Curated annotation (Swiss-Prot):
It comes from the Eukaryota. Residues 1-31, 261-313 are annotated as: Disordered. Keywords: Cell cycle, Cell division, Chromosome, Coiled coil, Meiosis, Nucleus. This is Synaptonemal complex central element protein 1. GO terms for cellular component: chromosome; synaptonemal complex. The lineage of its organism: Eukaryota, Metazoa, Chordata, Craniata, Vertebrata. The keyword Cell cycle applies. It holds the Pfam family SYCE1. Residues 29-281 form a coiled coil.
Length: 313
């Protein structure tokens, strides 16, 4: 800018030399001032440039440091991302494992619950079976006692002494009925003989006798004798039939007694086996109580009860 002004001033006209010299002096002073100003500006610019260079160097240093730090942070970020990815994968695996464990625990809990229910059902079934066996045993014992009582009554009924007494009583009743029948027959014969003698006698009969024979009292007497004779015959027939029925019943009862005796022997064996199995179930393994066999008096009582049962039937 100062060079262009000097070049423009170097072309003065000849008429203005003096003015030019004056102006040149002024220009020189102004140029000096401008040069000083320019120098000052240049110095300031250089100082500013130097300062700017220093600031730029510091900024570059800071930028490099920040870049390095950024690179470090970026690397750390990548590393942290890798760690996060690994942790997430580990967490996913752990969650899956936890879900599997929970599913397994739920399944085991379900199986355990089913086992408990089955155990409860089996325990209830065992208890019901025990109660059923106990009831069957009690019913069998009651039936056995009843059979023993019937057998005892039958034995009492079929004792030889009692049978002999009953047969003697029947024979005596039969003889008594026969005697009564003979007596009634004799009485009837006498009455008939008297009637015949009265009806066939020669000579006139008295009026009273004729009236008596034709009266209702004579007819009633004859009818009474006939009824007595008929009743005696019926009693005799009933006694004979009763005696025959008693003998048949005695034979039937003896046969039934034999059958019941065989049945009691079979049932005694069954009771023995059932009692032994029940005692084994109640006592448990290793503590089985040996059942007591029936003694001779008990067997005799059993037969007596069976005979009583047959008698009542």
């Amino acid at each position: 800018m100062a060079g262009r002004s000097l070049a423009s001033k170097a072309e003065p006209t000849a008429g203005a030399m003096d003015g030019a010299e004056k102006a040149e002096g002024q220009d020189t002073s102004s140029q000096k001032i401008e040069v000083e100003v320019l120098i000052n500006r240049i110095n300031e610019a250089q100082q500013a440039k130097k300062k700017a260079n220093e600031d730029l160097g510091e900024a570059r240093t800071i930028c490099e440091a920040l870049q390095k730090e950024l690179d470090l942070l970026h690397g750390e970020k990548v590393h942290l991302k890798e760690i996060l990815s690994k942790k997430q994968e580990t967490l996913r695996i752990l969650r899956l494992h936890c879900q599997e464990k929970e599913s397994e625990a739920q399944r085991k809990h379900t199986v355990l619950q089913e086992c408990k229910e089955r155990i409860s059902a089996l325990s209830l079934q065992i208890e019901e079976e025990k109660n059923k066996q106990r009831q069957l045993r009690l019913a069998f014992e009651e039936q056995l006692e009843e059979l023993m009582g019937q057998h005892k009554d039958l034995w009492d009924f079929h004792r030889p002494e009692r049978l002999a007494r009953e047969i003697c009583a029947l024979d005596s009743n039969k003889e008594q009925l026969l005697k009564e029948e003979k007596l009634v027959k004799a009485t009837l014969e006498d009455v008939k003989h008297q009637l015949c003698s009265l009806c066939g006698a020669e000579g006139p009969s008295t009026l009273d006798e004729g009236l008596f024979l034709r009266s209702q009292e004579a007819a009633a007497t004859v009818q009474l004798f006939q009824e007595e004779h008929r009743k005696a015959e019926e009693l005799l027939a009933a006694a004979a039939q009763s005696h025959q029925q008693l003998q048949q019943k005695c034979q039937q009862l003896q046969q039934k007694r034999q059958r019941l005796k065989e049945e009691l022997e079979k049932r005694g064996m069954q009771v023995h086996a059932q009692a032994q199995s029940t005692q084994e179930e109640e006592a448990g393994p290793g503590d089985v109580a040996s059942p007591k066999p029936l003694k001779a008096p008990e067997e005799k009582d059993l037969e007596l009860h069976t005979e009583q049962d047959l008698m009542s039937s």
